Amino acid sequence: MSSALDLHGPPHVDRYLETNGEDGYNWRNGTTILLLFTKGRKSGEERINPLIFRDHGDDAHTVVASRGGTDEPPSWFLNLSEEPNVEVQIKGDRFPARARVATDAEQPELWKRMTEVWPDYDQYQQKTSRQIPVVVLERTKA
């Protein structure tokens, strides 16, 4: 069995779900992972993505739509751009949330905070001409 540090994509999601995040929440270099549940904009099917996150206040979390610095945004970002009502799972806590792109005023500080936990985001931004967005996931009532 591989360690959570080696996990990517579907195997990461599977282990996270099977263990309520006991295996998969803690990842590389002290980063923590949440699961983002979106509705596929074309298929309508549930999509689940493991993402590095950081808390933003009491009831919100931030993630970065980097896709490794490619010129195309990740599918999960396109999905939530079409349907911002999502679900988030942090360890065993799964809850509804509303996704929004950080405002121009918020972006610099939130970007700085995210690069503190994953410095590679700065390299990703240098690789692309698109502004890599920080996404705020705000907990909502069920």
For the regions a protein language model found, what residue spans apply to each?
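Hydrophobic secondary-structure block in the mid-to-C-terminal portion of proteins
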Residues: 136-142
